[in-house]
Amino acid sequence: MKITVLSLFENFFNEFKNTSIIKKAIANNLVDIEIVNFRNFSKDSHNKVDDTPYGGGAGMVLTLQPIVDAINHVKTSNSKVVLLTPSGKTYNQQIANQFKTFEHLILICGHYEGFDERIINYVDYEISIGDYILTGGEIAAMAILDSVIRLIPNVISVNSLESESFDNNLLDYPNYTKPYNFNGYKVPEVLLSGNHKEINKVRKEWQINKTKINRKDLFIKYLKEN
């Protein structure tokens, strides 16, 4: 899989690409991450990529020409283009699972006051990572990169993926490790029993209860589908 990020801040991704699972995935040729600065495609004599908004208003708006030319430069017939914007559809695990099937994913990071609205004519998806505002789309891009890359076969173990949060609309069950007793807080006895059938049963109950308390929206989905 190849993922191209269009950004004004290439250096933002240097440490990300050289850390942990992402670094291993790149080294093992499981994913190719390309960072492209769309300022390099500006035809303005001063390499400007923004301008004042029509109708007035605060801030500067990203102009179409550099971004569209950058898209056309990296895009192939197998590419899917994603605009990272607070007005997009909220990102979730289902979308991550969809994105991992694409041969080439292009993520567009905004900045300043945002994009010229006409950019939507050049993208396949408009995605938001939540109801809050960031200075730019780079953090959102890294969230999507991480969540998609870890789903690529052989990046992490299948067993780890099968028991994660959001599987079947349930949060993950609580995990415990040594020591057994920490300041009076003890590991539930059932986990020490060796009875895996009972452990699996209790863990499922914990998942349901945790989801019901912390994520009522997911719990409602779970009830509808089970």
Curated annotation (Swiss-Prot):
NCBIfam families: PRK00026.1, trmD. It catalyses: guanosine(37) in tRNA + S-adenosyl-L-methionine = N(1)-methylguanosine(37) in tRNA + S-adenosyl-L-homocysteine + H(+). Belongs to the RNA methyltransferase TrmD family. GO terms for cellular component: cytosol. Its EC number is 2.1.1.228. It comes from Malacoplasma penetrans (strain HF-2) (Mycoplasma penetrans). CDD domains: TrmD-like (cd18080). Specifically methylates guanosine-37 in various tRNAs. It is found in: Cytoplasm. It holds the Pfam family tRNA_m1G_MT. The keyword Mitochondrion does not apply. Homodimer. InterPro entries: Alpha/beta_knot_MTases, tRNA_m1G_MeTrfase_C_sf, tRNA_m1G_MeTrfase_TrmD, tRNA_m1G_MTases_N, tRNA_MeTrfase_TRMD/TRM10. One of its GO terms (molecular function) is tRNA (guanine(37)-N1)-methyltransferase activity. Keywords: Cytoplasm, Methyltransferase, S-adenosyl-L-methionine, Transferase, tRNA processing. It is an enzyme of class 2 (transferase). This is tRNA (guanine-N(1)-)-methyltransferase. S-adenosyl-L-methionine binds at residues 110, 129-134. GO terms for biological process: tRNA N1-guanine methylation.
